[in-house]
């Protein structure tokens, strides 16, 4: 900044452009902002789990809620069953229409039955869509809001699946191919110095 005494003017220059607003390492587990880890079983409900987990994370740590995956996957406006799979826009539509979320205790997962008489216990007012390769934007969203739902291509069908994309030494999965995403997960942190 500089001050011109002749014109009595203060000039300030913003030099912060390009400066990261997030740390090089961040983990929502260390801040009690990760919901219960659940198993989708053989159903194609990863998109529901990712959507509900991201919402639960956004409300933490102040509110420790568990939302129904069953309700989102069966009481939405998309005529699909739990084996058909889905995608993030289906979860967004369900939440934006205030069809849910509802509590998991009121509509538990895996019984193949849902209740249509349940009202949304939260009203989602705003959702953020981040460009797929905007890693800085993803980090900022995790840092500010909590878990971020994302889609990836996975070659892993079960814990017994062997794949060249999974590194057991670093517990990491990295697929850089061109196949379309087939699985949804929630990003809960990062480490810029993680061994690759």
Language-model features, listed with the residues they occupy:
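Catalytic-core signature of thiol
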Residues: 1-196
């Amino acid at each position: 900044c500089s001050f011109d005494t002749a014109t009595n003017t203060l000039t300030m220059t913003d030099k912060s452009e390009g400066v990261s607003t997030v740390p090089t390492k961040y983990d929502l587990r260390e801040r009690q902002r990760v919901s219960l880890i659940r198993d989708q079983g053989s159903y194609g409900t990863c998109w529901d789990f990712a959507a509900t987990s991201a919402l639960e994370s956004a409300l933490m740590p102040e509110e420790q809620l568990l939302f129904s995956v069953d309700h989102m996957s069966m009481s939405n406006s998309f005529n699909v069953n739990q084996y058909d799979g889905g995608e993030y826009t289906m979860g967004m539509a369900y939440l934006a229409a205030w069809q849910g979320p509802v509590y998991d205790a009121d509509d538990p997962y895996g019984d193949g039955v849902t209740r249509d008489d349940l009202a949304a216990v939260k009203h989602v007012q705003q959702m953020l869509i981040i460009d797929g390769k905007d890693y800085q934007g993803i980090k900022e969203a995790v840092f500010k809001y909590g878990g971020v739902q994302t889609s990836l291509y996975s070659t892993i069908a079960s814990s017994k699946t062997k794949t060249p994309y999974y590194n057991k030494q670093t517990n990491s999965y990295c697929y850089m191919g061109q196949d379309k995403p087939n699985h949804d997960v929630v990003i809960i942190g990062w480490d810029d110095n993680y061994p690759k």
